[in-house]
Amino acid sequence: MPFDEINREFSFPLQKIIDEQKLEVIYMPEDGENTLISDHEINRPGLQFAGFYEYFDKQRIQVLGKTEWAYLNTLEPEVRRSRIDNLLSYKFPALMVTRNLEIFPELLESAKSNEMPLLRTEESTSVFTSKLVNFLNLQLAPRITRHGVLIEIYGEGVLILGESGVGKSETAIE
């Protein structure tokens, strides 16, 4: 019986996070709620706003917290727009803003032009990221499905495994 099923990649739709985490939808492109999430890690894009993209993983959800927001707030609107456009051009699954922070007009415009889901939560960044990572780990955890029947023989548990339809249940009948 092959055990390579555990290496299978899992994914789920973005809408599941929106519902579970009770996120406010600021902007959702057409069919954006069906964007598939397949990475259990997240990214805080502070270094990317500063221009460093060498190890940037565009498969991850991006979480913008107070630190990133404060940095963007120090920039002139044209520079802020450029930095935001550059980040959102990478087409990651979604951008989530924490602490009910104000959405910069440049951020909303860029989300629309890049067809990027833009979501917001009132939770603090550390609480939200902890909940989100736990949720992602649960949804994307490796799993295996096996066909079997569990029986007791002289007080010991025995698990009979086999392909579907080969007679495991019939074997277990007394």
Give names to the regions the model predicted.
Residues 2-87:
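Gly/Thr-rich phosphate-binding loop signature of adenosyl cofactor/nucleotide-binding cores
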Residues 60-63, 93-96, 116-119, 157-159:
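Structural motif
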Residues 65-67, 99-100, 122, 154-156, ...:
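Fold-independent oxyanion-binding glycine-rich loops
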Residues 75-79, 99, 103, 143:
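Short secondary-structure boundary/capping elements
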Residues 86, 110, 174:
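Hydrophobic/aromatic ligand-binding patch that stacks against planar heteroaromatic rings
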Residues 91-94, 100-136:
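Charged, amphipathic alpha-helical linker segments immediately N-terminal to NTP-binding catalytic cores
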Residues 136-155:
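P-loop NTPase nucleotide-binding/switch module
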Residues 156-174:
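Glycine-rich phosphate-binding P-loop
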